[in-house]
Regions:
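Nucleic-acid endo/exonuclease domains
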Residues: 2-162
Length: 162
């Protein structure tokens, strides 16, 4: 899951409300705050979720299949999104840098742990691709390099070509 950003407020709620020029600004800013705070997943997943919602595309997040698991049945593999489009559906996976090279996001892992995580991730990716191929499921993989504009452009291009 993505990192949650916490903000420490130094102003009381009463002062915050009083600083707002209108009641609607207060309501809108509060709703906006909670919408962002409640979103789950990585930043890339949030961008995809917002893109799909804004384009009225139906989707399900963290799609699993009962017969696709890693190591044992308690570790079902998840696809980022199941997208319903044009009387059909397909799966979408975001592919960040950890899918292509060993990555130490937290900075606290040993080289051996980094390599093991990478190899396990590669195995899970292979299993997902194999499962989709075997079951005639369309799997779209979109690179996520941390640039929201690039991701949105890639999503637009993907939908144009469907």
């Amino acid at each position: 899951m993505g990192n949650k950003r916490r903000t420490i407020y130094t102003m009381s709620l009463k002062n915050y409300i009083n600083k707002m020029s209108t009641h609607s600004k207060f309501i809108n800013s509060t709703l906006s705050y909670w919408k962002i705070e409640k979103q789950k997943g990585s930043k890339g997943e949030q961008i995809v979720r917002n893109f799909l919602t804004n384009h009225n595309v139906k989707f399900k997040e963290q799609k699993t299949f009962h017969n696709l698991y890693y190591k044992d049945k308690n570790h079902l593999l998840r696809f980022d999104f199941q997208i319903f489009f044009k009387d059909s559906w397909f799966l979408l996976e975001l592919q960040g840098q950890q899918h292509y090279k060993p990555t130490n996001f937290g900075g606290h892992l040993t080289e051996q742990e980094i390599q093991q995580n990478f190899e396990e991730g590669q195995e899970r990716d292979r299993m997902k691709k194999e499962y989709c191929s075997k079951h005639n499921i369309i799997l779209k993989c979109v690179d996520w390099n941390g640039n929201p504009k690039t991701l949105i452009k890639d999503l637009q291009e993907m939908f144009r070509n469907l």
